[in-house]
Amino acid sequence: MENPSPAAALGKALCALLLATLGAAGQPLGGESICSARALAKYSITFTGKWSQTAFPKQYPLFRPPAQWSSLLGAAHSSDYSMWRKNQYVSNGLRDFAERGEAWALMKEIEAAGEALQSVHAVFSAPAVPSGTGQTSAELEVQRRHSLVSFVVRIVPSPDWFVGVDSLDLCDGDRWREQAALDLYPYDAGTDSGFTFSSPNFATIPQDTVTEITSSSPSHPANSFYYPRLKALPPIARVTLVRLRQSPRAFIPPAPVLPSRDNEIVDSASVPETPLDCEVSLWSSWGLCGGHCGRLGTKSRTRYVRVQPANNGSPCPELEEEAECVPDNCV
């Protein structure tokens, strides 16, 4: 048997190297799984607001404006795109959305990412919810190369607070998930330093990263979500995605349908009652000592209620205190 020539051996080696390179290029990076499901899948997405005065009694917005949710804005994308991520800085577009609910710049950023990197398959949106408790929904489409879903909804009113999902994968190996449901909690976009729902605009300089707001962080009594008696906040919203049984076809964005009062959640049995303790001011200075000369008199000081208790929270303490004293300026 003839030995292969050096040229033939080199050709085989180059061929093997090329095949290995192509194979490596097709592998996911960073442990990312490969989606081999059917090319397309369509889902309904339902956002449910759970921001009630019972679950979140502290500083609950009742007017100008009352508690509500902005429109939902999301995208089906690949791992090359990120709409937002915890512990990272938000883009200018997401800053505008989180602070003012303006979606134009964020839409342009998503569009640019889709054109430059082919990383976005489709954009979807759902109408705003005009109250803290209510629902809104839309439809979206994903495909093998764009199986991740991200979205944001602004908390209204708030400095720069929002809820959302970052890169939820609807593909599970060779099949699409039938459904997915997640509880949602508030996040701070890191662009405004306001502590309360109705805080005036106060830009964070330098800009901070996205952080989750918890019952103890920020650790300040003025914060609207500060509930030191709770280990964790109850979910402020929930999202549910359900796969639709329809034959794949060209995706047509759904026409927006404004939510009606029929969508409001009225089942109070499932709403957690978050206790809100009474908060009072510091004591005032002692008043003048009153009484007759040669005898002990009394003086008093007062304080006032800053936050009324709710949902079996700790009651308010005494608001006036007296103490014995020696009258001044006796003649």
UniProtKB/Swiss-Prot annotation:
<dbReference type="InterPro" id="IPR044004">
    <property type="entry name" value="TSP1_spondin_dom"/>
</dbReference>
<keyword id="KW-0732">Signal</keyword>
<keyword id="KW-0479">Metal-binding</keyword>
<comment type="function">
    <text>Cell adhesion protein that promotes adhesion and outgrowth of hippocampal embryonic neurons. Binds directly to bacteria and their components and functions as an opsonin for macrophage phagocytosis of bacteria. Essential in the initiation of the innate immune response and represents a unique pattern-recognition molecule in the ECM for microbial pathogens. Binds bacterial lipopolysaccharide (LPS).</text>
</comment>
<feature type="signal peptide">
    <location>
        <begin position="1"/>
        <end position="26"/>
    </location>
</feature>
<keyword id="KW-1015">Disulfide bond</keyword>
<dbReference type="Pfam" id="PF06468">
    <property type="entry name" value="Spond_N"/>
</dbReference>
<dbReference type="GO" id="GO:0032755">
    <property type="term" value="P:positive regulation of interleukin-6 production"/>
</dbReference>
<keyword id="KW-0391">Immunity</keyword>
<feature type="binding site">
    <location>
        <position position="160"/>
    </location>
    <ligand>
        <name>Ca(2+)</name>
    </ligand>
</feature>
<dbReference type="GO" id="GO:0070062">
    <property type="term" value="C:extracellular exosome"/>
</dbReference>
<protein>
    <recommendedName>
        <fullName>Spondin-2</fullName>
    </recommendedName>
</protein>
<feature type="binding site">
    <location>
        <position position="192"/>
    </location>
    <ligand>
        <name>Ca(2+)</name>
    </ligand>
</feature>
<keyword id="KW-0130">Cell adhesion</keyword>
<feature type="binding site">
    <location>
        <position position="188"/>
    </location>
    <ligand>
        <name>Ca(2+)</name>
    </ligand>
</feature>
<dbReference type="InterPro" id="IPR000884">
    <property type="entry name" value="TSP1_rpt"/>
</dbReference>
<feature type="site" description="Important for metal ion-dependent interaction with integrin">
    <location>
        <position position="141"/>
    </location>
</feature>
<dbReference type="GO" id="GO:0008228">
    <property type="term" value="P:opsonization"/>
</dbReference>
<dbReference type="GO" id="GO:0031012">
    <property type="term" value="C:extracellular matrix"/>
</dbReference>
<dbReference type="InterPro" id="IPR009465">
    <property type="entry name" value="Spondin_N"/>
</dbReference>
<feature type="domain" description="TSP type-1">
    <location>
        <begin position="277"/>
        <end position="331"/>
    </location>
</feature>
<feature type="domain" description="Spondin">
    <location>
        <begin position="31"/>
        <end position="221"/>
    </location>
</feature>
<keyword id="KW-0399">Innate immunity</keyword>
<dbReference type="GO" id="GO:0045087">
    <property type="term" value="P:innate immune response"/>
</dbReference>
<dbReference type="GO" id="GO:0060907">
    <property type="term" value="P:positive regulation of macrophage cytokine production"/>
</dbReference>
<dbReference type="GO" id="GO:0007155">
    <property type="term" value="P:cell adhesion"/>
</dbReference>
<feature type="glycosylation site" description="C-linked (Man) tryptophan">
    <location>
        <position position="283"/>
    </location>
</feature>
<dbReference type="InterPro" id="IPR036383">
    <property type="entry name" value="TSP1_rpt_sf"/>
</dbReference>
<dbReference type="InterPro" id="IPR038678">
    <property type="entry name" value="Spondin_N_sf"/>
</dbReference>
<keyword id="KW-0106">Calcium</keyword>
<dbReference type="GO" id="GO:0071222">
    <property type="term" value="P:cellular response to lipopolysaccharide"/>
</dbReference>
<dbReference type="GO" id="GO:0032760">
    <property type="term" value="P:positive regulation of tumor necrosis factor production"/>
</dbReference>
<dbReference type="GO" id="GO:0051607">
    <property type="term" value="P:defense response to virus"/>
</dbReference>
<dbReference type="GO" id="GO:0002448">
    <property type="term" value="P:mast cell mediated immunity"/>
</dbReference>
<dbReference type="GO" id="GO:0046872">
    <property type="term" value="F:metal ion binding"/>
</dbReference>
<dbReference type="InterPro" id="IPR051418">
    <property type="entry name" value="Spondin/Thrombospondin_T1"/>
</dbReference>
<dbReference type="GO" id="GO:0003823">
    <property type="term" value="F:antigen binding"/>
</dbReference>
<feature type="disulfide bond">
    <location>
        <begin position="35"/>
        <end position="171"/>
    </location>
</feature>
<keyword id="KW-0325">Glycoprotein</keyword>
<dbReference type="Pfam" id="PF19028">
    <property type="entry name" value="TSP1_spondin"/>
</dbReference>
<keyword id="KW-0272">Extracellular matrix</keyword>
<dbReference type="GO" id="GO:0043152">
    <property type="term" value="P:induction of bacterial agglutination"/>
</dbReference>
